[in-house]
Amino acid sequence: MNGIVLELQKEAMDKNADIESLLRKSYFIARKLKLPEFEEWIQCEQEGYGKKETPEYRMIQGQLKALNPVRGWIPVVMESAIAEKAFTKTKLPNSVSELYDLYQNAESSMLVMNLPAERNKYVAKCCGFNTQFRLEFGKNQIYSILSRVKNNILDWALTLEESGIVGRDYSFSEEEKKIAQEKTEITNYITNFWGTTTDVQVQQLSLIHI
């Protein structure tokens, strides 16, 4: 029987692999190897990030639109690149299961995110007119987030193998556990997920079809 790390690699390369199953198997491996930071990342992907820092790969960009009483939803033109970044980019802290459901149940290629009340009030003040605002974006951006999670798992599993960690059935030798603790490319692996820190808004996504 192949080691569990090799199993994980094979499953992560399968385009039809269940992402939650991949996360559970990754959590099992991380727990066995005593890699708490990677465990925490997996739990955040499973349960959502909440108030914790959300990785850069969960960034989406859309088009900000305002509700015009006569013309309906119209694009909002920004006066500066800074304002455009602030109002058209956001990070999605939702769990992967929520994101997957949103992607699967989308009735069109576009999704809509209504702005929270306080955020809407702030945008209205900046734009100079009081109305309802929303962000429209392609559902392919949700797919990109899910794909990135799978790629992270695959790359992590390859890093383990390259370091001599493959497991025997569903257990690891003391030598493999020692390697996992001593190699910084393993213990610090999740630093690859964050990239350059930004001050972009983080917003929970609930689906509206257009």
Where are these regions (language model features)?
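Surface-exposed polar/charged interaction patches
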Residues: 11-15, 29, 48, 102-106, ...
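Internal, Lys/Arg-enriched amphipathic helical interaction segments that engage polyanionic partners
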Residues: 77-190, 194-196
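Conserved small/polar residues in nucleotide/adenosyl-binding loops
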Residues: 208-210
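The right-handed parallel beta-helix/beta-solenoid scaffold, focusing on the short coil/turn
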Residues: 198-200
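Function-dense linear segments that define catalytic or interfacial modules
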Residues: 202-205
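Charged, amphipathic alpha-helical oligomerization/scaffolding segments
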Residues: 7, 14, 18-21, 25-28, ...
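N-terminal interaction modules that seed assembly of large macromolecular complexes
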Residues: 17-72
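Membrane-interacting alpha-helical segments
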Residues: 1-10
